[in-house]
Swiss-Prot record:
Source species of the chain: Homo sapiens
Coarse class of the protein's main subcellular location: membrane
Subcellular location: Basolateral cell membrane
Residue numbers on the Extracellular membrane side: 31-123, 176, 234-236, 349-354, 408-411, 493-542
Official protein name in the record: Organic anion transporter 3
Tissue specificity as recorded in UniProt: Strongly expressed in kidney. Weaker expression in brain and skeletal muscle. Expressed in adrenal glands.
Phosphoserine: residues carrying this PTM: S4
BP GO annotations: monoatomic ion transport; organic anion transport; prostaglandin transport; response to toxic substance; transport across blood-brain barrier
Record SUPFAM superfamilies: MFS general substrate transporter
Disordered: annotated segments: 515-542
Length: 542
């Protein structure tokens, strides 16, 4: 007996699973607010130098730029030199008295003057946030395999709630960055644990649907953020508003059961049995749950129990050729997705469209994108869906290179299409990665994969600097990288209707089966029924 068959006995898709996914999904909905928060809390309004205290604003104080508007970072020296014939020869100086911002909304930019020579600090804040997610993926992936999925999830909720609230009350920019780093750290733990718990408690046939449902939670969160930002013009109150709900999620997470597979592999079979019986009662299958015994559980999952004695680290991801190839291809796909996604998602201001409207459009494109992803994952398979998403995104980004800047509508359409494809790529990757890695090292594999997408999201803003050399260079780099990631996905094995691998040895058997001609259809059908046939694919979860 496998876990999938045990799950069938206690209810593989009952009330418990729907409530379980709902409890995991609500935090994901609000997590989108944190990921994209800096679009609004770090918005840069039109600004110019504040005139000296003894001068009035005017063209004789503020030089005009090429666009006929006041220079943003320079002003004329005051008082003017009377011997100069006209203002064109007057000396200019930096904004010694600060700036005037033409906006009724405040942000970290207006509060700490992150403009002109300090404008790089704005990007640094986002990079620090992404660094927190990156480090969190490294640290929490291993801790989750050691101490369980639920404890890491619960602590991550509390960390995000506390650090997000702390950022709202930060007195200085350095302290704000520290709290943003901790926010990223917490988000990484939430993402990793949610993915694992979703996949391990949902039957195979429903994995794609339930995982994509979690993806929709993130999508709807993107709809909520523009409304919140419009209604709450003060960045501190906006930061606090999106952080407080995680205190509630921290409390509700105590209801979330631990992964049964993890409990068995950790030698806690008695606790696993209690949870299975509670799930059976919740799903209206109390008698089936009562018939399960500790001896039966240990006997039928003896293989998994014996694996608890083995210790696995990130180095084991490179132990066998197939695992090495998988890790390389997945790492490239994750890097390319994060690299290209955040180039579009955080570049909303570049398209000359109303910030709030464009953010809603960017979020809205995820709805059809994820629906198409569900169908594609279920019928075309994982590696085809993954490759197509990245290849199409790369093509759309490269096309931006050839569209003139004044054709803003065309550029916006291409960007929205590319963003939708990359969102689809994320949804597929979470599911695909969790299905490819064996149970004994799944969370570590997810952690390493998330590391690469965060590296991509950190490097992405730096590539924009190359636009100062030639405007088309950034999009060429983003587009080619996405194409490479899509090509790498073609070398990954298909997992549609395949059992979740429990051990590294299972992957070797996978490889051997793939090389053999289909001689024994009856045996193959039986093997497919073992862990997964009861159920199907999912999102970006475990």
């Amino acid at each position: 007996m496998t876990f999938s068959e045990i799950l069938d006995r206690v209810g593989s898709m009952g009330h418990f699973q729907f409530l379980h996914v709902a409890i995991l999904g609500l935090p994901i909905l609000n997590m989108a607010n944190h990921n994209l928060l800096q679009i609004f809390t770090a918005a840069t309004p039109v600004h110019h130098c504040r005139p000296p205290h003894n001068a009035s604003t005017g063209p004789w104080v503020l030089p005009m730029g090429p666009n006929g508007k006041p220079e943003r970072c320079l002003r004329f020296v005051h008082p003017p030199n009377a011997s100069l014939p006209n203002d064109t020869q007057r000396a200019m100086e930096p904004c010694l008295d600060g700036w005037v911002y033409n906006s009724t909304k405040d942000s970290i930019v207006t509060e700490w003057d992150l403009v002109c020579n300090s404008n790089k600090l704005k990007e640094m804040a986002q990079s620090i946030f992404m660094a927190g997610i990156l480090i969190g993926g490294l640290v929490l992936g291993d801790l989750s395999d050691r101490f369980g999925r639920r404890p890491i999830l619960t602590c991550s909720y509390l960390l995000l709630a506390a650090s997000g609230s702390g950022a709202a009350f930060s007195p200085t920019f350095p302290i704000y960055m520290v709290f943003r780093f901790l926010c990223g750290f917490g988000i990484s733990g939430i993402t990793l644990s949610t993915v694992i718990l979703n996949v391990e408690w949902v039957p195979t046939r429903m994995r794609a649907i339930m995982s994509t449902a979690l993806g929709y939670c993130y999508t709807f969160g993107q709809f909520i953020l523009p409304g919140l930002a419009y209604a709450i013009p003060q960045w501190r109150w906006l930061q606090l508003t999106v952080s407080i709900p995680f205190f509630v999620f921290f409390l509700s997470s105590w209801w979330t059961p631990e992964s049964i597979r993890w409990l068995v592999l950790s030698g806690k079979s008695s606790k696993a049995l209690k949870i299975l019986r509670r799930v059976a009662v919740f799903n209206g299958k109390k008698e089936e749950g009562e018939r399960l015994s500790l001896e039966e559980l240990k006997l039928n999952l003896q293989k998994e129990i014996s694996l608890a004695k083995a210790k696995y680290t990130a180095s084991d991801l490179f132990r066998i050729p197939m695992l090495r190839r998988m890790t390389f291809c997945l790492s490239l796909a994750w890097f390319a997705t994060g690299f290209a996604y955040y180039s579009l998602a955080m570049g909303v201001e570049e398209f000359g469209v109303n910030l709030y409207i464009l953010q809603i459009i960017f979020g809205g494109v995820d709805v059809p994108a994820k629906f198409i992803t569900i169908l594609s994952l279920s019928y075309l398979g994982r590696h085809t869906t993954q490759a197509a998403a990245l290849l199409l995104a790369g093509g759309a980004i490269l096309a931006l290179t050839f569209v003139p800047l004044d054709l803003q509508t065309v550029r916006t359409v291409l960007a929205v299409f590319g963003k939708g494809c990359l969102s689809s790529s994320f949804s597929c990757l979470f599911l695909y990665t969790s299905e490819l890695y064996p149970t004994v090292i799944r969370q570590t594999g997810m952690g390493v994969s998330n590391l690469w997408t965060r590296v991509g999201s950190m490097v992405s803003p730096l590539v924009k600097i190359t636009g100062e050399v030639q405007p088309f260079i950034p999009n060429i780099i983003y587009g080619i990288t996405a194409l490479l990631g899509g090509s790498a996905a073609l070398f990954l094995p298909e997992t549609l209707n395949q059992p979740l691998p429990e051990t590294i040895e299972d992957l070797e058997n996978w490889s051997l089966r793939a090389k053999k001609p289909k001689q024994e259809p009856e045996v193959e059908k039986a093997s497919q029924r073992i862990p997964l046939q009861p159920h199907g694919p999912g999102l970006g979860s475990s």
